[in-house]
Amino acid sequence: MEMDVTRDTVEVLPQHKFDIRSLEAYLNQHLPGFGSDHRAVLTVTQYRSGQSNPTFFLQKGSQAYVLRKKPPGSLLPKAHKIDREFKVQKALFSVGFPVPKPLLYCSNASIIGTEFYVMEHVQGRIFRDFSIPGVSPAERAAIYVSLVETLAWLHSLDIHSLGLDRYGTGVGYCKRQVSTWTKQYQASAHQSIPAMDQLSTWLMRNLPDSDNEECLVHGDFKLDNIVFHPKECRVIAVLDWELSTFGHPLSDLAHLSLFYFWPRTLPMINRGSHIQENTGIPLMEELISIYCRRRGIDPNLPNWNFFMALSFFKLAGIAQGVYSRYLMGNNSSEDSFLTANTVQPLAETGLQLSRRTLSTVPPQADAKSRLFAQSRRGQEVLTRVKQFMKQHVFPAEKEVAEYYAQNGNSAEKWEHPLVIEKLKEMAKAEGLWNLFLPAVSGLSQVDYALIAEETGKCFFAPDVFNCQAPDTGNMEVLHLYGSEQQKQQWLEPLLRGDITSVFCMTEPNVSSSDATNMECSIQRDGGSYIVHGKKWWSSGAGNPKCKIAVVLGRTESPSVSRHKVHSMILVPMDTPGVELIRPLSVFGYMDNVHGGHWEVHFNHVRVPASNLILGEGRGFEISQGRLGPGRIHHCMRSVGLAERILQIMCDRAVQREAFGKKLYEHEVVAHWIAKSRIAIEEIRLLTLKAAHSIDTLGSAAARKEIAMIKVAAPKAVCKIADRAIQVHGGAGVSQDYPLANMYAIIRTLRLADGPDEVHLSAIAKMELQDQARQLKARM
């Protein structure tokens, strides 16, 4: 749901009222910009959520802020440390982690009765109901993927570089948690609950051996503490850092997983039905797999039952504390009295989990598909894509071919025929859109590999699902490295399919197989950058919807390495100085359906400095991140193309006769068919292995697998296409059959994203390094 302040807030509760005029006077003096509108009056309302530290929405004119303060009255020791919240948010904001911008901390209790801090108000979506009603299953899955990826990001931060000295002890975290929450519970208990005592004893006796692991943990990481982008399934702010410290990361992951084991006798924390009744929510094992993949750790987590039991124990302790404050009259929420009845069921659930062995590895399907198993959602989407292709895409091939044949000499040849645009709207309506991007689709690379194979069977199918190159790579760049302004201006319309883009890297006057040869310059000039140089093989530049170019160039700096002199910048195609010189043919084919491949000149093009992506000298780094998944996407589609070619070959071999027998009865043709099937199975497995490596280890660690399939797939498919052409004779190279065009496409892939020879050299280097490490280990 869109965050609605009027619905999320109430009049300040009587026990939390404070002197608003005193606060306003203080903020006028200490918060820059707060008093700029002298006619505006400060209004204060209180958020319904926030059971611990009272949270308030401040509005003054067009300015909006959020204030967090300590609750009044007698408090439990070491609780409600507002200064710690401010400190950790300030540190996280400085490294780009999504938190509201912290603005001011006040330790002077005389201003509003307690210490407090103020942060920016973040406008977005907060989902109070874990089942996330009102969105499609695809969006629901993507929201949960983004949620767990953000948690993995938090746990991957280097705590020593955050400047949070003495923020937490870290080592021995689990033992301290059990001890702390036992004491907190005992200090606030209003009745005896045997399950709490038994669970406390079990936890203390079963502490994990890995209690020395430490990172920054949130302490209360769950769906309704997250602000999502208004339109995208992307986390833009993590809230409520009261319980954060240095500790064991699995405590956060277990807390996020509470709803998977929620007792049916108890209403859900965030309303909603139970997990089994919601389509699109990943299985717990799938969520854990995504988390572990992002952190590069083994998904088979030891002591998972301990962390789940600890989470229920901790939540029961929190519930008891909330009820205790209600009894004392300083509760932060209207419905605090309801928590009294939750303590015992939570404790009993934790006790039950302590006696179970919990698996964190996704369940496997049948033995045949066990090697690279798709997720439940991946299987569902693949089935729907296959059905969509069969019912809508393949039947449209003839109409699309006729359009480009009729418009080959007109400007309309660069546009999509109406049938493709209709198919795109249909695919979007069915949720089969942007499937390549895990944060949007909720799919893994293995999931997408098999989907991309299906779309590779038709020239224009990737466009139908908004999964076409080079837009997929450019959207990946903006998603991973773009600023909020860049995402809003360019990523959002790309994700909607309103515009397309072009990637400008290869140059006509240098050997582009060595990317460091680049001549195109990107030079700073005040508040702008000047882009000057020539690019070619800029795919998609001729599409009338192409509105933005992602340009790689040199920002010269003699004091750094040759891989630190490249930068990447966004250049709107209508900027003065951007010139489309000519389209380039591929074996005579113009590739109209994808907007062609163009030579583009940038003649002293001036763009704002804010168009630079990530920073100066980061271009090569971004390129490697972009090309990793992008390279295997090409290979995934090529497997589908190979299947289509083999189908055409077999049809011909069955229909035609030579020398008194069918073509397939000639041993040489039969062997070609057999060798083609073997080759397809080989490259499919290697493609899936590369996808699996990206899923589990990340793009950097999967470099060798990516390079291997980038060499193997196009080469194998070229051979299959050559055999099919040979089976067709002269017809195979004519316009009557698609084989010549297919061969042109796949032959080009042996050059695109780096030629075979560059990848072979890289593979050899990595193999020698691996062998050297193994030899050293044996010695």
From Swiss-Prot:
GO biological process, one term: fatty acid beta-oxidation using acyl-CoA dehydrogenase
Location relative to the cell: Peroxisome; Mitochondrion membrane
Annotated positions binding FAD: 503-513, 537-539, 656, 726-730, 755-757
EC number: 1.3.8.-
Modified residues (N6-acetyllysine): 175, 765
Annotated positions of the N6-succinyllysine modification: 368, 390
Pathway, per record: Lipid metabolism; fatty acid beta-oxidation
Any one GO MF annotation of this record: very-long-chain fatty acyl-CoA dehydrogenase activity
Listed GO CC annotations: cytoplasm; mitochondrial membrane; mitochondrion; nucleus; peroxisome
InterPro entries xref list: ACAD10_11_N (IPR041726), Acyl-CoA_dehydrogenase (IPR050741), Acyl-CoA_Oxase/DH_mid-dom (IPR006091), Acyl-CoA_Oxase/DH_mid-dom_sf (IPR046373), AcylCo_DH-like_C (IPR036250), AcylCo_DH/oxidase_C (IPR009075), AcylCoA_DH/ox_N (IPR013786), AcylCoA_DH/ox_N_sf (IPR037069)
Catalytic activity: a 2,3-saturated acyl-CoA + oxidized [electron-transfer flavoprotein] + H(+) = a (2E)-enoyl-CoA + reduced [electron-transfer flavoprotein]; docosanoyl-CoA + oxidized [electron-transfer flavoprotein] + H(+) = (2E)-docosenoyl-CoA + reduced [electron-transfer flavoprotein]; tetracosanoyl-CoA + oxidized [electron-transfer flavoprotein] + H(+) = (2E)-tetracosenoyl-CoA + reduced [electron-transfer flavoprotein]; eicosanoyl-CoA + oxidized [electron-transfer flavoprotein] + H(+) = (2E)-eicosenoyl-CoA + reduced [electron-transfer flavoprotein]
UniProt entry keywords in alphabetical sequence: Acetylation, FAD, Fatty acid metabolism, Flavoprotein, Lipid metabolism, Membrane, Mitochondrion, Oxidoreductase, Peroxisome, Phosphoprotein
UniProt modified residues of type Phosphotyrosine: 323
Modification Phosphoserine occurs at: 210
Cofactor: FAD
Summary of the function given for this chain in its UniProt record: Acyl-CoA dehydrogenase, that exhibits maximal activity towards saturated C22-CoA. Probably participates in beta-oxydation and energy production but could also play a role in the metabolism of specific fatty acids to control fatty acids composition of cellular lipids in brain.
PANTHER family: ACYL-COA DEHYDROGENASE FAMILY MEMBER 11, MEDIUM-CHAIN SPECIFIC ACYL-COA DEHYDROGENASE, MITOCHONDRIAL-RELATED
Oligomer and partners: Homodimer.
Family affiliation: Belongs to the acyl-CoA dehydrogenase family.
The protein's name: Acyl-CoA dehydrogenase family member 11
Species of origin: Rattus norvegicus (Rat)
